[in-house]
Amino acid sequence: DMNGHQCRIARAALGWGVRELAEAATVSTQTVTRLERGEELRAATLDRIRKVLEEAGIVFISEENDGSFGILIKRSSLT
């Protein structure tokens, strides 16, 4: 799963603003902001945002044992 911190990091890594991500995921800018603040979103909305970021080359990682999380950026996304 993706959390709000990962969303913000992924968006920054891609050089996207809140508006670009919102438009790509067909959600409001307020929805993206709420996610990045740590508020709960409906599963379908969260999945839509995550899928857009994954299609742009982001891989979400998390370590269940200690709660660590982050992102990976596929090399092909850095062109």
Please provide the spans of the model-predicted regions.
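A detector for short, charged/polar N-terminal pre-domain segments
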Residues: D1-M2
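Alpha-helical residues within the helix-turn-helix
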Residues: A12, E23, R37
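Conserved hydrophobic/aromatic packing and binding residues within compact polymer-binding modules
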Residues: C7, L21-A22, V32-L35
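Major-groove DNA-recognition helix of helix-turn-helix-type DNA-binding domains
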Residues: E20, L35, R42, E55
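Helix-turn-helix/homeodomain-like alpha-helical modules used for DNA recognition
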Residues: I58-T79
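DNA major-groove recognition helix of helix-turn-helix/homeodomain DNA-binding modules
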Residues: A12, T26, A43-I61
